[in-house]
A protein has these predicted regions:
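Active-site-proximal flexible loops/turns
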Residues: 48, 104, 127, 181, ...
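Flexible loop residues that form catalytic
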Residues: 13, 98, 176, 257, ...
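His/Asp/Glu-enriched, well-ordered alpha-helical/loop segment
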Residues: 61-92, 143-144, 165, 169-171, ...
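Thr-Gly-centered strand-to-loop micro-motif
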Residues: 146-149, 173, 291, 297
Length: 317
């Protein structure tokens, strides 16, 4: 906290990273004393492991087993479990990369009890569904492995409505730049496929296209989801998240008339692929300014490493 780090991530799954209920509670109480906040990945690790063992015993090791071993109820159960712990601890909490209608219902129940619960989702949960895992081409299916996995189209519609009515506060990427070669290293065992997708470069254009241009959300809501709300929630506001005297001149210039086709050939990420290959966007990002300096111009980097460390304060939405 002395260095200005006020937000932390915890996991209820992944054996190498998850912590037990007592440790979660103790960490939340420590954060409460200092005004910090935690973002938590919520899936039921024990049942997921049992389902994985059953699939492997049956010889079911293709990417299609991935969503079947991480079904909707196991995200919802973990969210409900965490929210009861945070109720006892008396702290606000962030549910990161929420993907299901059932998990969102648990959030709404907690809010009805008076709890402060914030929600993040990602473009891939808004735009992709679990059919991507059932492709015959192993490599094509493997590139979509992430956790939570893609869900059903009905989950997508619930998430879009939640963005529009303010139930979800932020849209992030959960960006992971694993290459296709790294993804292929898990061939023959879906649990060995590195989990995560690249998404930093496409988030804004996809949210504008499928959200604003499609009439699901307004431009103002998009700006809040991508900028203002995260800045407030994680203690960077008003230095970040607002155009105002004294704030950093971090600006994105969006040209709604400059439609484009997303393709890996124009991506700067080390991943070398995009989950949205061939998708057409309504408009595109023209320029990105960082503290008043032109950093990106029509997809080309124009500035060197000019980032600075930003100490943060306790946030609030």
């Amino acid at each position: 906290f002395a260095a200005g780090i006020t937000s932390f991530k915890m996991y209820l799954t992944y054996p190498a990273m998850m912590i037990g209920d007592g440790a979660v509670y103790s960490a939340l109480k420590a954060l409460k004393k200092r005004g910090g906040i935690a973002g938590v990945h919520c899936e039921n690790a024990g049942v997921i492991d049992a389902l994985i063992a059953a699939h492997k015993a049956a010889g079911q090791t293709a990417p299609s087993s991935h969503p079947e071993c991480r079904p909707n109820p196991l995200e919802a159960e973990a969210v409900a479990h965490l929210l009861r712990i945070t109720e006892v601890a008396g702290v606000p909490i962030v549910i990161v990369h929420l993907s299901t209608k059932e998990a969102l219902l648990e959030v709404m129940r907690a809010r009805a009890r008076g709890q402060q619960v914030y929600v993040e989702t990602c473009p891939h949960y808004l735009l992709l569904d679990d059919s991507v895992y059932y492709q015959e081409d192993y490599s094509a299916a493997a590139r979509y492995i992430c956790a939570p996995p893609m869900r059903k189209k009905e989950d997508q519609e619930v998430l879009w409505k939640a963005l529009a009515n303010g139930t979800i506060q932020t849209v992030s990427t959960d960006h992971c730049s694993f290459t296709l070669q790294q993804k292929d290293a898990g061939r023959g065992d879906f649990t060995k496929i590195p989990g995560g997708l690249p998404g930093v470069e496409t988030r804004g254009e996809l949210l504008y296209t499928a959200g604003v241009a499609a009439g699901r959300i307004t431009k103002e809501q998009m700006c809040a989801l991508l900028s203002e709300n995260p800045a407030r929630l994680y203690g960077a506001y008003p230095r970040k998240g607002v155009i105002a005297p004294g704030s950093d001149a971090d600006l994105v210039v969006y040209d709604p008339a400059a439609d484009k086709t997303i393709t890996a050939g124009t991506q700067l990420s080390a991943a070398g692929y995009t989950p949205y290959e061939g998708w057409r966007t309504k408009g595109s990002i023209a320029q990105v300014y960082l503290r008043g300096t032109l950093a990106v111009d029509h997809g080309e980097m124009k500035a060197g490493p000019i980032g600075t460390y930003i100490p943060r304060h306790p946030g609030a939405l």
